[in-house]
């Protein structure tokens, strides 16, 4: 085990402070509508230009190991806030820095760090309760567009596209962000359930121009087994042929004699049919097939349930208004499953999402939920250069997370005003005469910083702006985009409650932990081995100028 370097007491905390200040300052320059960009060098390709706090934080690594520990802890604040709320990373970083700086002064003056931590925790509880009381639900498309615009650094196009996407696919719908081929940022919406499996044979195509099979008012046969023998299918095919309706077969595989017979019947016009491979793999495939069966009102044909293909009747098949199949995707629109069954299935999936510990599983469950509930929207981000594309795509993703947070917990006035309005509640908080009251004062000072920093980044005097906001009431605050004092809610300067809450909770949690730190342990830097004896002594002087 390598030797360790250990720092104690005040020197340890001061090293943490230097790391916290370095990272926080790099991130804080991006705060607000007039925040500046940060250019980040990449080991290959063009540098990244960003105004996203968490992107800046993730790139920072300091040379001093003790200072780096402080920076990494604040980086954790930004990452956690981004993961939980999708935005507010810069605010969280500014709050964490202020709480730690103010707390450190008090610890140096001899106050008890544990009592300070308790005071900070009590104050945060009061502020969170105030934010919830201040919160109002989003009222339709305009509120969502405003939240998206602010999170996308004032880009109204992004805000409007996200609002439109949410309106079309609903709160539970999946909205994905992809890179467009052109310069325009556009929205594509897929109605109904779509899965990434196309037709088993191009002979099933009904529209040669678009190379897709369109089935109007079809029956849907769902099975998790492989179909190779035609004999299994004959009874159900005869019933479907008599009904005159098209048929979509979703199976693990349709091959051999069965596929050949289906193709021949399709070409002769005897049967309007299309076969596709079942989506997913393993257990996920079984669940997706159950989703399709529930949506269309059919039954999954599974040997373990004692259901066989040859025993199927029309009542066991699903129905849909329209199904389109191309070489890559199948889309089922208006499945005719019972509403109660679909809602029960949705409830089961929601329960699984809450219990899931895996990010990947949760994402897949969320996709399944969206497909059952009503659709998928794709925002195609367009830009002139790759650098601009990356920056714009990151802003769209941030804005998307922020709008979801707004829909979930509502909105509060932006610009740091919601925090300032909670100061009155903190002044009434009684924690006795001990050091806890100083912990409350730490939070009081920290809550002024988001509004102060937004004003400073816009070229105003921060403390003067904060005092003027405190003289007002309700949503009255400083709109840095227009350099005016006004009702921020009416001006569309709003923040998701979840973002404001999460930023404060994460900042206070990490900063108060750092305050109670008394020792730091890090690996000692290894001494670089001295250059070899005289190995290069006889070489020509020109070697000295070479780069290694």
From Swiss-Prot:
ATP binds at residues 30-33, 51, 87-91, 415, 479-481, 495. GO terms for biological process: protein refolding. PROSITE patterns: CHAPERONINS_CPN60. It comes from the Bacteria. Pfam families: Cpn60_TCP1 (PF00118). One of its GO terms (cellular component) is cytoplasm. Keywords: ATP-binding, Chaperone, Cytoplasm, Isomerase, Nucleotide-binding. It is found in: Cytoplasm. Its EC number is 5.6.1.7. Its main location: cytoplasm. The keyword Chaperone applies. The keyword Nucleotide-binding applies. CDD domains: GroEL. Belongs to the chaperonin (HSP60) family. Forms a cylinder of 14 subunits composed of two heptameric rings stacked back-to-back. Interacts with the co-chaperonin GroES. Together with its co-chaperonin GroES, plays an essential role in assisting protein folding. The GroEL-GroES system forms a nano-cage that allows encapsulation of the non-native substrate proteins and provides a physical environment optimized to promote and accelerate protein folding. This is Chaperonin GroEL 1. It comes from Anaeromyxobacter dehalogenans (strain 2CP-C). The lineage of its organism: Bacteria, Pseudomonadati, Myxococcota, Myxococcia, Myxococcales.
